[in-house]
Amino acid sequence: MNRKYKSLWPVIMFVVLSGLQLIGLPAFAQGPGPGQRIPLPPIPIKGDTTHTLSKHFTPASAATKTPDAKGFIQRWLVLEPVKKEIDRNNIFTDNYLRTTFSNDNFSGDYTTVPKNGETVKVGNQELKWYALDSKAFNFNLYHFTYALNKPKYGILVWLVTVINCPEEIQNVRIAAGCNSGSMWWLNGQEALLLSGDRDMIADNGTSARLTLKKGKNIIRGAVINGPGMANFCVRFLDEKGTPVKNLSISYE
């Protein structure tokens, strides 16, 4: 008999403990007692709902603009985004970018400089140019599209700026970073292609050696992104990797 009871003892303990847990559940399910405050859900942080360009940009003026302390170019003509159906960023191969930038182009003349406020047509989309100075070293296209209440994801954005050099500067390189893919031209010639799903890292890619001619030099850029925050930064580096700053920037 003792052996029989000993073999049943674990079963009896399991039943007793299970019963105690069931009895205690209602107590745990009850609300706070008298004098206790009902916990409130966390208050979400209020986002930026202003949709204004002035938060991150200033309108470009006729005043002389030079690169920032680290040589980054902050003045750009920026076209409203071309809406694209892009579900993922790993499709940005060299061939994809070249084909897309060729098909969804506002002009086949890569030395043309649009006018501030001008509207152009890309496919069936009518889009406007804005001449802006970024308040940061980079130009955040998410902030730009958000401010205009335009699509923020699945976009292609065209860019143009004019670099004025007091003298010819040889053996410089375009250094750019972008999210996610981009292509850059100097005076009508392809200079740099950044393919793949990239994060915006300064100097993430550099061109071959280039020459900035005396006078006007035209940079054109195209940045494309699917999910995530579109963004870019550009500067010139000399042979020693030092930022080139003896130039000025305009939008005409």
Regions found by a protein language model. Give the residues of each.
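Accessory carbohydrate-binding/adhesion or oligomerization-edge regions at the termini
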Residues: 30-139, 222-252
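Aromatic-lined ligand-binding clefts that engage carbohydrates, nucleic acids, or primary amines
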Residues: 170-185, 219
